[in-house]
C-alpha cells in the first residue's frame, strides 16, 4: 500500500498520553493508531446516502426502559438485523443491536433510543461495508 507522509502537532499532555499508551501496549507503529482513529472519525462524520452497517450499543435499566425499547425496535424492524442482550445485574442490561440502513435513519434510531427513560448509554458504532444506493 502506498502512503502519504504528514506531520501533526499535538498538545504536550496528549502527546505524553499517546506515548505512554504506545509503551504500555507495545505498539510498534504509531501511524496505525492515527490511521484507525482517522478512519473512525471519517466514518462517523460521513454524509451521503450510503447503506451502512453498524452496532448500536445500549446500557439501560430494564425496569424503566424495556417497554419503550421494544416499541421503538419494532418501528425500525427493517433496519435491525439482530440483537444480543446481556444481564449485568438485577436491573442493568447491555444490548448490542446490529443495524443496516441509510446513516441518517440509523442516527435517528440511535437518538430515539437514547431519549428513552432508563437508557444510560446509546452509541452507534459504524462498521463496513458501504453500499451505494
From Swiss-Prot:
GO terms for molecular function: DNA binding; DNA-binding transcription factor activity; nickel cation binding. GO terms for biological process: response to nickel cation. The keyword Glycoprotein does not apply. Keywords: DNA-binding, Metal-binding, Nickel, Transcription, Transcription regulation. Its cofactor is Ni(2+). It comes from the Archaea. Binds 1 nickel ion per subunit. Ni(2+) binds at residues 74, 85, 87, 93. Belongs to the transcriptional regulatory CopG/NikR family. Transcriptional regulator. This is Putative nickel-responsive regulator. It comes from Saccharolobus islandicus (strain L.S.2.15 / Lassen #1).
Amino acid at each position: 500500500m502506498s502512503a502519504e507522509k504528514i506531520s501533526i502537532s499535538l498538545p504536550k499532555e496528549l502527546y505524553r498520553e499517546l506515548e505512554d499508551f504506545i509503551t504500555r501496549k507495545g505498539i510498534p507503529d504509531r501511524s496505525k493508531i492515527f490511521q484507525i482513529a482517522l478512519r473512525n472519525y471519517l466514518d462517523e462524520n460521513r454524509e451521503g446516502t450510503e447503506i451502512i452497517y453498524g452496532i448500536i450499543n445500549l446500557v439501560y435499566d430494564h425496569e424503566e426502559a424495556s417497554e419503550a425499547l421494544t416499541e421503538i425496535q419494532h418501528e425500525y424492524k427493517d433496519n435491525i438485523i439482530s440483537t444480543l442482550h446481556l444481564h449485568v445485574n438485577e436491573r442493568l442490561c447491555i444490548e448490542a443491536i446490529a443495524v443496516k440502513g441509510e446513516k441518517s435513519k440509523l442516527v435517528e434510531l440511535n437518538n430515539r433510543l437514547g431519549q428513552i427513560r432508563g437508557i444510560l448509554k446509546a452509541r452507534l458504532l459504524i462498521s463496513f461495508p458501504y453500499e451505494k444506493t
